[in-house]
């Protein structure tokens, strides 16, 4: 891998981000209600499975940096769009819903993958973590815990991105039909508690309204903050199963806590409004860049090599997230 792949990769991502912004302002995109993030993932997947592999050796480090570091920075700065009042308004509803969905999704995925589909346990554990918490970030965090092979990580990430991308389109389409049972606030919690990736949550909510997007992201960040204790629990369970006492490094999602810190700073107006407006603009570009990079690294070939079972698992879990998640959210909204 060449030393300048970080710089060239970031330049490449910057060009694609500029292109996405142009496409998002076209009449077609505006009439179809396609957000910049939705266009970014589609464009990324298209390029990632056509010409990008031919230039990946020159841009790989930059694309990986955008997919990881820029995504986390984008989520941290997203806190400047919110205040403590916004976070408190989500309330116990989001905490209860997120907890139920996390536990049920993880256990259901394990049962379907290991007991029903007879899949490789590493792939199933990684997929379960990605579906139940925060997508690729959770998968990457679980890799040292599960000792998973790199190609297993690629398969799990591909499944998450594919079905998370489907969710991005599905939830906005469902909203008009489910508005009778869930208002904007509740639908935001529904998205945040059941869509795979943080960026996908933002895209799905943003395709409905800014209010839904804000609530969805806050709800999602509650799930993200559950990652650290979740990893500790999974590590303990796997160690117990394997009868080992090896110490495993746990990846703590500090960006989730920094997200809250930015919201605190914004709540007390510690930064001038015109600077906050600039930060929000920069944040939008960071999220577009991260989503584009995520699409570029989604390789359809990895899914083909793994066979049909990962796709079946991803589809079954998506059905639970959409249908089961709806009933869980309706039930919780009736209780609180």
UniProtKB/Swiss-Prot annotation:
Annotated transmembrane regions: 5-23, 30-52, 62-84, 91-113, 123-140, 153-175, 221-238, 250-271, 275-297, 310-332
Entry keyword set: Cell membrane, Membrane, Transmembrane, Transmembrane helix
Cell compartment(s), UniProt: Cell membrane
Membrane topology reported for the UniProt record: Multi-pass membrane protein
Pfam families: Cons_hypoth698
Domain of life: Bacteria
Family according to the record: Belongs to the UPF0324 family.
Name of the protein: UPF0324 membrane protein PM1461
Taxonomic lineage from the root: Bacteria, Pseudomonadati, Pseudomonadota, Gammaproteobacteria, Pasteurellales
